[in-house]
Amino acid sequence: MNVLYTKIFFILILTRTSSALKCVQCFTGYGNIVQDCNKTSYSEPKECADPLSNYCFIGTRYENGTEYIQRYCAIFSIKDQCIEKNNIKACIYTCETDGCNSASRLQISSLVTSIISVLYLITFX
């Protein structure tokens, strides 16, 4: 019976690995390493190394007029949100389809976030 469970386990793992999620994976402006995540060479989705990765992640930080971007695979989903404190704005987005964390996805999300922020300020301020 244990042999049967072992076979099923490996079949499930191999099946999941062969259909792994593909996310854009790059970062900008950390230490001496700088990549432009908006360039075509970094915008091609790559298969996530961790078979548990079910989400793609985009993290942005705006500080002193500079934008820092991270795009990676993620194991869990985080509610899309932006936080602003001490003149630093950080935004987090997750999604579930191949390549959904590309530069075009971020531009759409940033536009939606900006519109919601303006509507909030008009309504509640």
From Swiss-Prot:
Secretion signal, residue range per the UniProt entry: 1-20
The keyword Cell membrane appears for this protein: no
Tissue specificity annotation: Expressed by the venom gland.
GO cellular component labels: extracellular region
Free-text description of this protein's post-translational modifications in UniProt: Contains 4 disulfide bonds.
Keywords of the record: Disulfide bond, Secreted, Signal, Toxin
GO molecular function: toxin activity
Location, primary (coarse class): secreted
Domain of life: Eukaryota
Compartments reported by the entry: Secreted
Entry's family note: Belongs to the scoloptoxin-05 family.
Miscellaneous section: The scoloptoxin-05 family has remarkable similarities with the three-finger toxin family commonly found in snakes.
Protein name, as recorded: U-scoloptoxin(05)-Sm1a
Organism encoding this protein: Scolopendra morsitans (Tanzanian blue ringleg centipede)
